[in-house]
């Protein structure tokens, strides 16, 4: 048995999960998520718990078992609590600001870099060197945060760039002059 797949998912109060064939719909206070799963994996809703089971022990079914359970759990947590990723800008003159629904980054290029948040994802700028990406879909929050970080990933010599909060950047020593 998959150790992750055999765990039950507890549905919190205020969240409803409905199954239509192999499509799961999860509604909660933060929003609604719909996802289609592989029809070979069985999803059962009993009271306020979700159980995921697989037909056989072959490698493909074992992989799908844990993945299906993890995605369903992320959907339930997302619509009830939500997800957030914090990014920090480190470097002289690096700053972020919000203009309407756009995030504008000045990170050392000749032009500012702009991002528009997709539906269901919010961008907050509490300080000009800090960005918070919030939303109920873990996939969209992580993707937008990764795209923002990819504009100027942290470099190993001075540590300048955009990094996740708490991310450790491996530092290198520069060349030694003669």
UniProtKB/Swiss-Prot annotation:
This is Large ribosomal subunit protein uL6. One of its GO terms (molecular function) is structural constituent of ribosome. Residues 159-178 are annotated as: Disordered. One of its GO terms (biological process) is cytoplasmic translation. Pfam families: Ribosomal_L6. One of its GO terms (cellular component) is cytosolic large ribosomal subunit. The keyword Ribonucleoprotein applies. It comes from Listeria monocytogenes serotype 4b (strain CLIP80459). This protein binds to the 23S rRNA, and is important in its secondary structure. It is located near the subunit interface in the base of the L7/L12 stalk, and near the tRNA binding site of the peptidyltransferase center. Keywords: Ribonucleoprotein, Ribosomal protein, RNA-binding, rRNA-binding. Part of the 50S ribosomal subunit. Belongs to the universal ribosomal protein uL6 family.
């Amino acid at each position: 048995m998959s150790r992750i797949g055999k765990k039950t998912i507890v549905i919190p109060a205020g969240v409803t999960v409905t199954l239509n064939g192999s499509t799961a719909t999860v509604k909660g206070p933060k929003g609604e998520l719909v996802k289609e799963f592989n029809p070979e994996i069985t999803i059962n809703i009993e009271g306020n718990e979700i159980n995921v089971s697989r037909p056989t022990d072959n490698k493909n079914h074992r992989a799908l078992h844990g993945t299906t359970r993890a995605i369903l759990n992320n959907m339930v947590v997302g619509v009830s609590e939500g997800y957030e990723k914090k990014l920090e800008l480190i470097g002289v003159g690096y700053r972020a600001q919000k203009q309407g629904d756009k995030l504008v980054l000045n990170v050392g290029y000749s032009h500012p870099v702009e991002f528009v948040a997709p539906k269901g994802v919010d961008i907050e700028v509490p300080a000009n060197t800090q960005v918070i990406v919030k939303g109920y879909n873990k996939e969209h929050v992580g993707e937008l945060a990764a795209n923002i970080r990819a504009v100027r990933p942290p470099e190993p010599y001075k540590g300048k760039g955009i990094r996740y909060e708490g991310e450790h950047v491996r530092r290198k020593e520069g060349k030694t002059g003669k």
